[in-house]
């Protein structure tokens, strides 16, 4: 209570008297506080005196965020993020205004960093009592409390990522990553280790917290261990993936492998500033760390990705949903889980690799041999998703050296396309995460691959919707990708379908929950296709016995996907859209009470066909796959049982799931079928023929 009364005693003082008092305190506390704190505050008061005296109070429209894991929180330090359209000069003005208004209330604040190149905002050290004041400042979008991030580490690996037709000791991919620069945000690095000597430039950037505990001894080998090992995995002379890649080191983790979100943000801004001052070729940023979900961390990654930087991060070692952590949950980041030599998920004591829809793929992450900081010729074995992410960063460097013009979306699609598929035992994952987690282990592409005209597609799952009847789930593709089809999935089977709609100038896939349902997922099929032009044609409920029909009526447009949604709770059978391979392949047909949507696209050389596989009686799963040379763009269930849970694409296979038939009382008349729409570019066929 004494503190509160002392603060209030400052409040009625005239401003000149307050300035004198602050200057006096500055002299008295010169030994306790950093130089300039009080002078900075006085300048802020002087510059804002006229403007703030009569400033109106603003309603609190900004939001406050903090880490969901209490032990990782760092109260007292906050990232203040301004609105997207705010001019960069407003960052410093808003910081000064906050300091001045805080001083008028008897609080001291310290501006630790002003962001100019990464995002509009600043980092401030202040009392939590000032949050309400800060949230009301003009231009403020949101404020996030700082939190901790941690290193994620607790030669079969090189053989695993090498294409099967080669052996690790004889295959040397083209250029070895020499055209790419990799930034590593980690601990410090022993740059004179024989594995990485001459390959690593240690920058002067350092933003790390103090080590925990007064007895911690900062041995060089401890401070350098994590970063040195990962640098060796990325570009080591003997054990590295991309042996020709150059690497720059930024220190954001202390000797205990611990850092902060704010320190990492400043590191990312350092990279962005360097990119602006001296543009170079392709950049890969390796973030082998994880913290709790952070809106500002994810936003910073998004901005850097939009600037053309490829970011690769560890999924995390918490045997948990990767979407609960940052930067793993950022859609613009390539998130990597860890597998062992048998292609199984890595277990680390009671924990292990993270999983879920936010993971893009897995890579070797157990017992990885790499450079040790114990001596300049020592090696050590380490495990974790940090090591897995380092492998993918190396593979990305190799791919970008071979094709420097690749965008982030193109690189991600290639990483997925060339991965080893369906090799992970999904039983290791929690049951509700198995369908969401990609069964992919990273691999280098063959040296002779030609992907210029290939149609690449990937499946993107939404977050789970709420359980209310009107709840919806929404998923979107990356900026450079095209949404070619939309489907939905509900574990309870109670859903009201899905549709493609426009949102913010971008097409999204929206799925609808039903009354009594437990929630629904929206599933997008996101593809890369040059010069593509797509539209959605919708037919409202027909009310006729023949059902609702819609087709692609524009010349040159082909059907890439069908979807349907309905307002009534139970249509019985014939819920999903119907596609008939015979007669009219560009037509979708559905229940008479449902709206039917056809996704129709035009691109040079694009051709599509429909494949169907049905069974006379319901089973838990029905699949149909596209042939080699064709790419799955659409996946749906044909009319049949009302017990269908939904349909989704796994690589090039369409999967239709239903509830356990042993408990649903199904009859033999209730048939079900999986329908795939398979597309290809004729340019690819022609190019293949020319090579033969």
Swiss-Prot record:
Positions of the pro-segment in this chain: 31-152
Chain positions with Sulfotyrosine modification: 38
Cofactors that this protein relies on: Ca(2+)
Annotated CDD domains: PCSK9_C-CRD, Peptidases_S8_PCSK9_ProteinaseK_like
PTM annotation (Phosphoserine): residues: 47, 688
Known function: Crucial player in the regulation of plasma cholesterol homeostasis. Binds to low-density lipid receptor family members: low density lipoprotein receptor (LDLR), very low density lipoprotein receptor (VLDLR), apolipoprotein E receptor (LRP1/APOER) and apolipoprotein receptor 2 (LRP8/APOER2), and promotes their degradation in intracellular acidic compartments. Acts via a non-proteolytic mechanism to enhance the degradation of the hepatic LDLR through a clathrin LDLRAP1/ARH-mediated pathway.
Assembly, per entry: Monomer. Can self-associate to form dimers and higher multimers which may have increased LDLR degrading activity. The precursor protein but not the mature protein may form multimers. Interacts with APOB, VLDLR, LRP8/APOER2 and BACE1. The full-length immature form (pro-PCSK9) interacts with SCNN1A, SCNN1B and SCNN1G. The pro-PCSK9 form (via C-terminal domain) interacts with LDLR. Interacts (via the C-terminal domain) with ANXA2 (via repeat Annexin 1); the interaction inhibits the degradation of LDLR.
InterPro entries given in the database record: PCSK9_C1, PCSK9_C2, PCSK9_C3, PCSK9_ProteinaseK-like, Peptidase_S8/S53_dom, Peptidase_S8/S53_dom_sf, Peptidase_S8_subtilisin-like, Peptidase_S8_subtilisin-rel
Subcellular location, principal: cytoplasm
Record's protein name: Proprotein convertase subtilisin/kexin type 9
PTM remark: Cleavage by furin and PCSK5 generates a truncated inactive protein that is unable to induce LDLR degradation. Undergoes autocatalytic cleavage in the endoplasmic reticulum to release the propeptide from the N-terminus and the cleavage of the propeptide is strictly required for its maturation and activation. The cleaved propeptide however remains associated with the catalytic domain through non-covalent interactions, preventing potential substrates from accessing its active site. As a result, it is secreted from cells as a propeptide-containing, enzymatically inactive protein.
Organism per entry: Colobus guereza
Site feature Cleavage, where: 152-153, 218-219
Domain notes: The C-terminal domain (CRD) is essential for the LDLR-binding and degrading activities.
Active site location: 186, 226, 386
Keywords assigned by UniProt, alphabetized: Apoptosis, Autocatalytic cleavage, Calcium, Cholesterol metabolism, Cytoplasm, Disulfide bond, Endoplasmic reticulum, Endosome, Glycoprotein, Golgi apparatus, Hydrolase, Lipid metabolism, Lysosome, Phosphoprotein, Protease, Secreted, Serine protease, Signal, Steroid metabolism, Sterol metabolism, Sulfation, Zymogen
Intrachain disulfide bonds: 223-255, 323-358, 457-527, 477-526, 486-509, 534-601, 552-600, 562-588, 608-679, 626-678, 635-654
Glycosylation sites: 533
Signal peptide region: 1-30
E.C. code: 3.4.21.-
Residue segments, region C-terminal domain: 450-692
Subcellular location(s) per record: Cytoplasm; Secreted; Endosome; Lysosome
